[in-house]
């Protein structure tokens, strides 16, 4: 019978999240998904990322079967954005063998950005309007995020060939780079026709690469917004209603005869209810398959809820709860850009860990305090 592993507190920053990696007793748990659609079918899309020898590839509509079996295809995706029945869009992304892992992960991000570009714009519009009095993050916060991204790239360049975790971090950044490129193609296509989308009639993409990086880091921004005084929370001592607002998430683990069940409730703001259930099959790139409760533009969960199946019998469920820490001085002393964001450390652990204890050890390295 599987049992919970050790968990690790985040020692720095405003919040302490408890990320609980659990060994799964049921082999098929990474196929976990929300209840099936109860309404009529919605029109979905299938796309493929085709590698081009001369450089950047492109997404193209998949009009028939084939997927990874087609020449030059490094990743495929299917997406159904219908949320009326139960609130969830569905995204499935598969990497294809025959290319190096970075090209596959770039392709995985590309097809996701291409099919969910409009949803990414809508999610950021909701987020920025709700979180920033000026409607956009302050310049100092953007500079901090840019510095953190630059530091992460520098570490990958310096250590990827000798350290597996930095090699995996390189794949995470390739995933993000692909998301940006796919979104840009999506925006270009939507901007060329007045289809009612947010890109219609616009000369260029609504979201620049750094904004997409911030969109993908909204969990970490919960601390950083307050640190830079650009969020509605501001700085200093938090009133009781603010404390209550940031006490996030509940997790349930139940042991039954011959099985272990896990459930999670995320306490998200109403503006964050653009939700997407994602299935990532990165078997050919990373030896992992993940089922993730997520949102548009996020390459992780943020809730957090993951079910992970990996080579060698790896079976993990990862859930997050939050104990908030409201200490502005502590935040300013310990949070710096020479670190890895929470979602990056969680992704590293999901991709590399062979068990719960190793998961927590990977997660604590280069802790950003966010």
Name what the model sees in each region.
Residues 10-31:
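Cleavable N-terminal signal peptides of Sec/SRP-targeted secreted and luminal proteins
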Residues 3-6, 28-358, 362-370:
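N-terminal mature-domain region immediately after signal-peptide cleavage
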């Amino acid at each position: 019978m599987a049992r919970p592993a050790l968990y690790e507190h985040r020692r720095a920053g405003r919040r302490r999240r408890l990320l609980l990696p659990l060994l799964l007793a049921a082999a098929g748990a990474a196929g976990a998904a929300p209840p099936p659609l109860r309404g009529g079918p919605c029109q979905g899309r299938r796309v493929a990322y085709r590698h081009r020898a001369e450089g950047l590839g492109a997404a193209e509509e998949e009009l028939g079967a084939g997927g990874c079996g087609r020449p030059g295809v490094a990743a495929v995706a299917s997406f159904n954005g219908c949320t009326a029945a139960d609130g969830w869009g569905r995204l499935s992304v598969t990497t294809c063998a025959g290319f190096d892992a970075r090209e596959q992960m770039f392709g995985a991000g590309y097809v996701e950005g291409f099919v969910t570009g409009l949803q990414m714009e809508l999610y950021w519009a909701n987020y920025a309007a709700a979180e920033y009095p000026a409607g956009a993050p302050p310049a100092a916060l953007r500079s901090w995020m840019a510095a953190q991204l630059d530091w992460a790239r520098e570490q990958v360049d310096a250590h990827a060939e000798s350290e597996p975790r930095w090699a995996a971090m390189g794949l995470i950044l390739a995933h993000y780079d692909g998301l940006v490129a796919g979104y840009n193609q999506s925006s270009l296509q939507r901007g060329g026709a007045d289809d009612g989308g947010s890109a219609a009639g616009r000369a260029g993409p609504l979201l620049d690469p750094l904004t997409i990086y911030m969109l993908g880091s909204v969990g970490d921004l919960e601390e950083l917004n307050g640190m830079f005084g650009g969020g509605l929370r501001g700085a200093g001592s938090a009133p009781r209603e603010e404390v209550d607002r940031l006490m996030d998430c509940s997790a349930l683990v139940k042991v039954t005869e011959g099985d272990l069940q896990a459930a999670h409730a995320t306490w998200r703001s109403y503006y964050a209810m653009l939700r997407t259930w994602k299935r990532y099959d990165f078997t050919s790139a990373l030896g992992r398959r993940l089922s993730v409760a997520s949102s548009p533009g996020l390459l992780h969960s943020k809730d957090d809820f993951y079910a992970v199946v990996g080579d060698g019998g790896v079976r993990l469920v990862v859930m997050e709860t939050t104990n908030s820490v409201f200490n502005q001085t502590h935040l300013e002393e310990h949070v710096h850009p020479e670190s890895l964001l929470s979602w990056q450390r969680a992704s590293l652990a999901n991709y590399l860990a062979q068990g719960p204890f190793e998961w927590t050890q990977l997660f604590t390295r280069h802790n950003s305090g966010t």
